[in-house]
């Protein structure tokens, strides 16, 4: 089974409606500017070759080239996965974590557990519905978690560490900062710190900042909600200047 690259909205509509009954449709939203998508594109290709079931369909969508499709699912960050079954969204993941993607695919498609061995790669962003940290994460040393944080804060030019996801924030401060980024039309990656206690606690020390959300630009800590608001008040072009 191969991944179908979406070229038009008509093609997307056809593939998500024609002979789609009882099929698990996996939508993969990506962008050329997002480095984590490179890893997940490779993972998706590898996994799709191992899934021989006729009831799974993989569609790859460039979020920038097809905004009309991205808007339908309120895509605010990439990589982003949407699992659809019988016309209903059954799960959404914003992640560059192969283990989380494969685990979700296994559960929803009843795929063989051996699929888990076909995807390996670095972790970066979050699974909106993850239940918690893995055993590997619990055993991380301080050096290992710091190395992971360095990768995470640089996973996208603008990285937001928040409670919840852009589509479902878990606190008012996170919701406000997402709104500010969208208002200024800033592309951003995000990490749901509620899903990973190691990241949640270690990032406070890493950033020397005790609360969330936290915003990073080009790998540099910018501040929390109040600091970002103040920065914009002082410089309306704050984001443009920070991204230079």
Swiss-Prot record:
Membrane-traversing stretches: none
Acidic residues bias: start-end ranges: 127-143
Keyword Iron attributed: yes
InterPro entries xref list: Glutaredoxin, GRX_PICOT-like, Monothiol_GRX-rel, Thioredoxin-like_sf, Thioredoxin_domain
Homology family: Belongs to the glutaredoxin family. Monothiol subfamily.
PANTHER family: GLUTAREDOXIN FAMILY MEMBER, GLUTAREDOXIN-3
Protein name: Monothiol glutaredoxin-4
Organism encoding this protein: Saccharomyces cerevisiae (strain ATCC 204508 / S288c) (Baker's yeast)
Gene behind this protein: GRX4
